[in-house]
């Protein structure tokens, strides 16, 4: 029965049962409604907090575009991870539900792909080259959510540098596999083991979180869930 189809009595009865099941007094919650302020859009979306997150390091106008664009990307990454989580938690999962969430993920990636012109056409190259130097050694490479999307989308072996895949299997410790991920090559000298400041900062912040995430999605990633779908 949908909430909008309930009579007033049925709705009150449902509320009564809900709070009693939680060991709480339904009347206390109902009386609280007498004093609660109606929800407002700007409070629900937390607009003031959201619009206060853009802090420039220079006075160059296009730096603001750069900051907002990447913050929007991170929000979309969060939407993608949210959909992947719904798939991974569903046990079992139907083909219909899998396809629904995958369709949402695909649309989010379409949104990202279609936004590249904001970077290419929406900023003056001269301004970008100036404020970019103030961000060193920070890089979009350090987007933890992007890396998590990779971990949650496929089996770990598919993210290993091709040069080392033959040495990695299901019994390989996650820490060892992590050190041989394809993107490690962007900041690591495999002959000396030396890592760039960019990679060291990234790992100082997220290494433990990444290892936990890799373990969590080892058998719950999108590819593994897809293979478990009914034939």
Role assignments for model-derived ranges:
Residues 2-231:
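Surface-exposed peri-terminal alpha-helical interaction modules
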